[in-house]
Amino acid sequence: MKSAVVQLPGLNRDRDMIAALTKISGHQPVTIWQTETEIPDVDLIVIPGGFSYGDYLRCGAIAARMPVMQAIIDKAAKGVKVLGVCNGFQILVEAGLLPGALMRNASLKFVCREIKLKVVNAETDFTRAYAQGQVIRCPVAHHDGNYFADEATLAKIEGNGQVLFRYAEGTNPNGSINDIAGVMNEKGNVLGMMPHPENLIEAAHGGSDGRGLFASALDVVAA
């Protein structure tokens, strides 16, 4: 699987993502800087976590207006898979690639801990390595992960199976509506999620529950 990791000022999880993708796919991702307007032929584009542009204005608002985002939008329109984790999720929402909004955590505090996720839809290119309803462990680290959507949007994404992950009962760290932790677009090739699967891919790091997401994408390419 060929992949690319986007780099923007303030993102600080790019090295973790590069390490995870390299270990799982056997190929080191190319890195794409914010000013680039072309992205090479890849199977997966990842926008990692962090605090792009210091989270000024709104989380992801400035990053979503960088030149590289139009290239990502164009690739997504052609069916290339795009994954946004944490700040990457916020950027995808700000860019209009995913529905809804991400607000300040209900606690008004930065949350950094391990939580449990429930796989709501295991029939996608991002989740097929998991079982339907499987509960996995995954770390979170964010201040603005409270997912919100209006009633019409919420009904649509729930009805379409666009919600892939929910925080398991009693573990919602931010107040997200319907315990939503990860959402994909209607086409099924763009996923945004607040938890960090790249930080739980091998036993030496405490477990490998996050590996399934990347393995799913890899299996689609290999099929």
Curated annotation (Swiss-Prot):
PROSITE patterns: GATASE_TYPE_1 (PS51273). This is Phosphoribosylformylglycinamidine synthase subunit PurQ. Its EC number is 6.3.5.3, 3.5.1.2. InterPro entries: Class_I_gatase-like, PRibForGlyAmidine_synth_PurQ. Part of the phosphoribosylformylglycinamidine synthase complex involved in the purines biosynthetic pathway. Catalyzes the ATP-dependent conversion of formylglycinamide ribonucleotide (FGAR) and glutamine to yield formylglycinamidine ribonucleotide (FGAM) and glutamate. The FGAM synthase complex is composed of three subunits. PurQ produces an ammonia molecule by converting glutamine to glutamate. PurL transfers the ammonia molecule to FGAR to form FGAM in an ATP-dependent manner. Residues 3-223 form the Glutamine amidotransferase type-1 domain. Pfam families: GATase_5. It catalyses: N(2)-formyl-N(1)-(5-phospho-beta-D-ribosyl)glycinamide + L-glutamine + ATP + H2O = 2-formamido-N(1)-(5-O-phospho-beta-D-ribosyl)acetamidine + L-glutamate + ADP + phosphate + H(+); L-glutamine + H2O = L-glutamate + NH4(+). One of its GO terms (biological process) is 'de novo' IMP biosynthetic process. Gene3D superfamilies: 3.40.50.880. The active site is at 86 (nucleophile), 196, 198. Part of the FGAM synthase complex composed of 1 PurL, 1 PurQ and 2 PurS subunits. It comes from Rhizobium etli (strain ATCC 51251 / DSM 11541 / JCM 21823 / NBRC 15573 / CFN 42). Its main location: cytoplasm. GO terms for cellular component: cytoplasm. It comes from the Bacteria. Keywords: ATP-binding, Cytoplasm, Glutamine amidotransferase, Hydrolase, Ligase, Nucleotide-binding, Purine biosynthesis. Pathway: Purine metabolism; IMP biosynthesis via de novo pathway; 5-amino-1-(5-phospho-D-ribosyl)imidazole from N(2)-formyl-N(1)-(5-phospho-D-ribosyl)glycinamide: step 1/2. It is found in: Cytoplasm. GO terms for molecular function: ATP binding; glutaminase activity; phosphoribosylformylglycinamidine synthase activity.
